[in-house]
């Protein structure tokens, strides 16, 4: 049984309730939360769950065991969605879901996604990939750190943070999340250190995006998804920061103008107050939905 509900789960179910028989691709299956609810609601659907995280796939397999024969799990990046569809020979694809957030259980694993605990600086979603957060913070030049933190984190104190990271690592390597979070914390002016959002949030986001090449993968995957989904099929995206949301918005707009898509969400859907109370991490989520013409 699902131990917690995935972000915007009610809204996902609303948009998927009328899907016809076929395959639904959960391109970021995580622990299988959305997939579980979709399979339960839609007895004629089969799900292909994709994730690059081995542990996520283990959790999803256990969670979806009641639906044996109606789901397949694939270890892959969602940017390879076209190859997955071809290899598994799935047709028609009536829906595709992208949830770009970090799974709650990934935050619990000691992989450096969270600055709430002392953990090694890793941040890889695919633990077999080479680039780690440790390498980024200890070996990237100051100018590159500034660019990443400024662009991917939209952090106004990026220059100061990059400078302080480089100063600190001259004395010793930055090995843990706590060390990095403390450097960022001290880079903020004292009067801004105690706001609702921790000063390290944007920097951690930026480094995670760099390590996992997230934005380029989102762009590539969306382009492919639009050509994979069948006519009348839907694409649902859940973004957690403005850079992701902007990519989705611009891609949907481009394909609407090309008469490929009908955008079903004129403005992004955000979580209701009760969901935010239950799951504060959902606060920044934005959902956009489009239908293939």
Curated annotation (Swiss-Prot):
One of its GO terms (biological process) is rRNA base methylation. InterPro entries: RsmH, SAM-dep_MeTrfase_MraW_recog, SAM-dependent_MTases_sf. The keyword rRNA processing applies. HAMAP family: 16SrRNA_methyltr_H. Specifically methylates the N4 position of cytidine in position 1402 (C1402) of 16S rRNA. This is Ribosomal RNA small subunit methyltransferase H. Its EC number is 2.1.1.199. It holds the Pfam family Methyltransf_5.
